[in-house]
Amino acid sequence: MEQRVAITGIGAVSPLGNTALATWAAMCAGTCGIGPITHFDTDAFAVKVAAEVKGFDGNEYFGKHDAKHLDPCVQFAMAASDEAMHDAGFDVEGAIDRERLGVYVGSGVGGMQTLVDNVHTIADRGPRRASPYMIAMMIPNMASGNIAIRHKAKGPTLPVVTACATSAHAVGEAFRAIKHGYADAIVAGGAEAAIIPDAVAGFTSCRALTTNPDPATACRPFDADRDGFVMGEGACVLVLEGMEHAQARGAHIYAEVVGYGNTDDAYHITSPDPDAAGIARAISLAVAEGDVKPSEGLYINAHGTSTKLNDSSETAGIKRALGEDAARAAHVSSTKSMTGHMIGATGAIEVMACAMALEQGVVPPTINYHTPDPACDLDYTPNRAVRADLTWALSTNLGFGGHNAAIALRRYARS
């Protein structure tokens, strides 16, 4: 028998705050989390700004001994998972059968800082000086591995790696596993910590990043003057749980996950398909599985990267999937205008925004939106959050390699 699936825990470490609720409050306030890059000297770089996590001290959180054996990417993931598990009430002994608790937490690039540090060490001091922890700190599955160890989660584990769609696919696959009875609950999400010279240089070379040095206007999704995305970092983790399991223990339910679409453009390694067939099909699959009725109040948290190709293609995909009238009636926004592009964490934090929007009836804005683009002609909730009577939400994400994901949610009706 298929199970309904609830979101019962949320956790985040983001450029807007080091907890989920702080992040959500900042989104609703239209706060910009972008600023000058402080992680390294940018004098030789065309890119000057990023959305950095602020005030998170791994040494303080984990202790110096443990922190030095955890890449920042994994530190973010573990901190977010701690918050989500506590929020769900699963940090208490006996709260859940640990053999029925899974972990689906991925990363787009994994422990890149660890890899780069060790490459320099090997080049300067020889191969014998490589850290014995190098491999375990850099491989992308170790966010899931460390979270499973920390929370004694012995159920299904599936670290997902699909670039910018990573944590959307993680949430979607967790939804499927619970729906079909493979777990009672799954910790799902993603993390990234790639604001380092090597990653910024690489993204700059493929012309993905904005070179606008003004933090207040650098990221402007769907605006006619957009010219690239802003790198972000952090983590977001959600606890997905079978509805009956959650209701039986009296858990707080933020929203219900009802549908999931997973497709590929099969078009280009970095560029989205201009005809938007792939993302449109992902949306259509999620809408069909969830029996979504857009006319009843729909919020779409769009991928909205602030690149010329993505934003126009995604707009076309939304209209292709929903039809012109339903697409124009929907509330749309890109919270990347505030968080930057958190790569492997971005899908989960945007699903979190959808869940909170449904629960509170608030649509977070797309900030820095000033000049309309004829190719992007939907209601993008410009610059200020709005109140709305919402029943449904969609979160869409696209990743290098042509990966597309769409997650459909429904407002939870409390009796």
Question: How does the language model describe each region?
Answer:
Residues M1-D66, E244-E256, M352-T366, R410-S415:
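ACP-dependent fatty acid/polyketide chain-elongation machinery
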Residues R4-T8, T31-G35, D214-G290, L298-Y299, ...:
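Condensing-enzyme catalytic core mediating Claisen C-C bond formation in acyl metabolism
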Residues I7, A20-T23, C28-A163, A191-V200, ...:
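Conserved beta-ketoacyl condensing-enzyme motif
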Residues L21-A26, M112-P127, A177-H180, V200-P213, ...:
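A glycine- and small-aliphatic-rich helix-loop capping segment at beta-alpha/alpha-beta transitions
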Residues A77-F90, P140-S144, A148-E192, V230-A251, ...:
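Active-site-proximal alpha-helical scaffold in enzymes
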Residues A84-D97, A246-I253, I283-Y299, A321-A326:
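Phosphate/pyrophosphate-binding loops at sites that engage ATP/ADP/AMP, CoA/4′-phosphopantetheine
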Residues D124-S131, H169-G172, R176, E192-A248, ...:
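Glycine-/small-residue-rich "gating" segment that lines the acyl/pantetheine channel
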Residues Y182-D227, Y260-P274, G304-D311, R328-D379:
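Acyl-CoA/ACP chain-elongation machinery
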